[in-house]
């Protein structure tokens, strides 16, 4: 809950572009404050942004695991959106706490990880040979909350959070390529499976490189299973694999060139020299955060499940247009246009 004491009612609401009533709603915790206004408020009161949350963040032990240091503003923005997600789930009666495999693993065991990946694919009824069209949709279909918004730092590819009450939540940096977001989503899934007890204390990849290797290997074999990769290579008569073949394979599996090159090397389809040559070619002109022949962003919808839940809540008259604007973090005129589009 926000620590907006009554003494802050002396603030002129116009200084942060809100009405006095809205400020009172923030104080009384009847309206969620959006991150942009919270930043302005923190600057006005000369307080760090985490000051406004009890015990630093609203979920207490709902801590974050990430492969890069995450600033408090990004964490608060994530928690703000998770609270909206939970709110709209309750409105439409769609709250889910998924069943999750729980296998603690500290050291890389490739055979064991492949077995777990195969078991989960079976459990989620996706088979062992078929490519996954959209891993993010797959996670959300199985009760994992995924939220996407932009961060200027490409090093922050994503992070995850968990507790028994709220469940499993993943953030993905929407500034990154679709392929990178797909891989990151399954990387974070691996942490839920193999490192769940680590969410009791905040960790980073730098503190435990071994657990990142486990998560990366799981993501690779889950998205590109060995038998499926071998079958595709054999059926297409790839005797020598150049970058042209890499692009064909990556498009089939909906992953990055980097992921495919690594899986080809792991399965003995290319040698070390070819592996290095293909990696260099993959990064040529686009850098390590770009993608050659990428999945088009226009074919991909951010926050698909959350937006559909909001739409359902509005269509069922469970929320007003102003609440729609608040949940989607858009202006009232945009909310009116969106509502009109849904109704027509």
Task: Indicate residue ranges for each PLM-predicted region.
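Active-site hotspot residues in diverse enzymes, especially metal/ion-binding acidic/histidine motifs
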Residues: 1-344
